[in-house]
């Protein structure tokens, strides 16, 4: 029998599908990435084509193995990590989606959320799912598809439709429709899963008019769910053995498996997660209570704060404002000026996430004077990412009663030294950047590898979490508080803007 030397992580993100191959020492051997189409049918709506998601993801698997000359029988397991909340509904007979995937960023269900609030469901949802009633989560997206796609409601009631977050869709496709499964971390993002009983919540399903028959089976994040022969020659079947939503996978990849450990991922959005172990901490500050992974991939509780616009605001500087030609240039221009010259950018393009939860907030730039130039605006945009992180971390520390000793960071924007130093200054906390910044893929690979015995336990992997650089806070306290006060004033200017605007039309 061929020696199994590798584990593959499939990282299905918001803008691209990636495959990352790791060896036994958790070194990255090969990476393949493909972008796919973003569909914007109207303002505030975001969709993906589920068939394109699957096509790009399966081709990256074949490509990553091919690039490194790895045969499929050398792969011990596949782990999947995915953009969370994004909703796919498909017909189990034809295998075809009844509608495009509705993406986590999509705000089309804001009115459904208002109706559900008016019916008094908010506190039940909060207490039992740990989430706030917001268009972000899958529940109202499924309801929208069933209510608006012709024939969908009838098919669902006849037991012909299946729902899945992206992990579920990929596993279903990769196993030729044999396995309909998700893990606790993804289930906890649907707004339909009871995090107290660890079961689908039948009361919420009934209120949303979603049949239980559509829901996948929920399993822990580290176990063999099924086998796939994608990328396999001669019928080799590779076990699919790990699943976790991208943020929980990153938390695991950063080795934050004990209560009180936290990380921030700077991707399209920013996601701060703190593991709270077996204790469910209820937030009084607009954070989410959600499920993460314990040391062996079993469900553990976590607090989460989501910032909708992190790296996406740098893309906006590049694509819409044309102030930079490459996202990496933002650091160079931001450091050409000493301060933002009193300017604050609040990138609330799709509303504000934690701790504000204002779907009607809109982006704003305040403090403009004649002396403000493009470098100040670039700097203020980067600073907004750090301020939003502080908003969330302050809330997290208040809820958990834990003062963070250091923040572990990952994601594309952590390569920006200016942003990382400013983050440490704003938080008055050390920021630790790991050597391997592919922590989301690492997390999925670890979960899969542990399930099949490729690694014995986390102790074996602890040494992999090396720190590349620590950023220590510099600012004096008075300056720190003054700047943060200015940020809070700027946020007030952005809040509830869309409501006011609609009244004027």
UniProtKB/Swiss-Prot annotation:
One of its GO terms (cellular component) is cytosol. Inhibited by fructose 1,6-bisphosphate (FBP). CDD domains: ASKHA_NBD_FGGY_GK. Pfam families: FGGY_C (PF02782), FGGY_N (PF00370). Pathway: Polyol metabolism; glycerol degradation via glycerol kinase pathway; sn-glycerol 3-phosphate from glycerol: step 1/1. ADP binds at residues 14, 18, 268, 311, 412, 416. Sn-glycerol 3-phosphate binds at residues 14, 84-85, 136, 246. InterPro entries: ATPase_NBD (IPR043129), Carb_kinase_FGGY (IPR000577), Carb_kinase_FGGY_CS (IPR018483), FGGY_C (IPR018485), FGGY_N (IPR018484), Glycerol_kin (IPR005999). Key enzyme in the regulation of glycerol uptake and metabolism. Catalyzes the phosphorylation of glycerol to yield sn-glycerol 3-phosphate. This is Glycerol kinase. The gene is glpK.
């Amino acid at each position: 029998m061929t020696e199994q030397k590798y584990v593959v992580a499939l990282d299905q993100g918001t803008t691209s599908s990636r495959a990352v191959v790791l060896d036994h020492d958790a070194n990255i051997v090969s990476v393949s990435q493909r972008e796919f189409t973003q569909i914007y049918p109207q303002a505030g709506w975001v969709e993906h084509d589920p068939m394109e998601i699957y096509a790009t993801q399966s081709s990256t698997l074949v490509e990553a193995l091919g690039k490194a000359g790895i045969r499929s029988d050398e792969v011990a397991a596949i782990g999947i990590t995915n953009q969370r909340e994004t909703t796919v509904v498909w017909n189990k007979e034809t295998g075809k989606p009844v509608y495009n995937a509705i993406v986590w960023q999509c705000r089309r269900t804001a009115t459904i959320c208002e109706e559900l609030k008016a019916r008094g469901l908010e506190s039940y949802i909060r207490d039992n799912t740990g989430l706030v009633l917001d268009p972000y989560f899958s529940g109202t997206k499924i309801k929208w598809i069933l209510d608006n796609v012709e024939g969908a409601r009838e098919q669902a009631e006849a037991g012909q439709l299946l729902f899945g977050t992206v992990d579920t869709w990929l596993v279903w496709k990769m196993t030729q429709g044999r396995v309909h499964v998700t893990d606790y971390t993804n289930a906890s993002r649907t707004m339909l899963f009871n995090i107290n009983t660890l079961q689908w919540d039948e009361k919420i399903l009934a209120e949303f008019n979603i049949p239980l028959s559509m829901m996948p089976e929920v399993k822990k994040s580290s176990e063999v769910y099924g086998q796939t022969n994608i990328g396999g020659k001669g019928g080799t079947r590779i076990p699919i053995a790990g699943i976790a939503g991208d943020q929980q996978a990153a938390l695991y990849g950063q080795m934050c498996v004990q209560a009180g450990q936290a990380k921030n991922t700077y991707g399209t959005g920013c996601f701060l997660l703190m593991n709270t172990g077996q204790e469910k901490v209820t937030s009084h500050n607009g954070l989410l209570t959600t499920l993460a992974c314990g040391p062996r991939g079993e469900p553990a509780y976590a607090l989460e704060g989501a910032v909708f616009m992190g790296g996406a605001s740098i893309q906006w500087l590049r694509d819409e404002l044309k102030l930079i030609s490459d996202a990496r240039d933002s650091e160079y221009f931001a450091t050409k000026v000493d301060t933002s010259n009193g300017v604050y950018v609040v990138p609330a393009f799709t509303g504000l996430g934690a701790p504000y939860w204002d779907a009607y907030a809109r982006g704003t730039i305040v403090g403009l004077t004649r002396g403000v130039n493009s470098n100040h605006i670039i700097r203020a945009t980067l600073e907004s990412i750090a301020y939003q992180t502080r908003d969330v971390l302050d809330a997290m520390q208040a809820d958990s009663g834990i003062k963070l000793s250091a923040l572990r960071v990952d994601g594309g924007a952590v390569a920006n030294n200016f942003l990382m130093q400013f983050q440490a200054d704003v938080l008055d906390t050390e920021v630790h950047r790991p050597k391997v910044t592919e922590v989301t893929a690492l997390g999925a690979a670890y979960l899969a590898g542990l399930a099949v015995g490729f690694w014995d336990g986390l102790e074996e992997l602890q040494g992999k979490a090396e720190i590349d650089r620590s950023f220590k806070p510099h600012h004096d306290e008075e300056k720190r508080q003054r700047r943060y006060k200015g940020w809070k004033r700027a946020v007030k200017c952005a809040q509830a803007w869309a409501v006011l605007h609609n009244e004027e039309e």
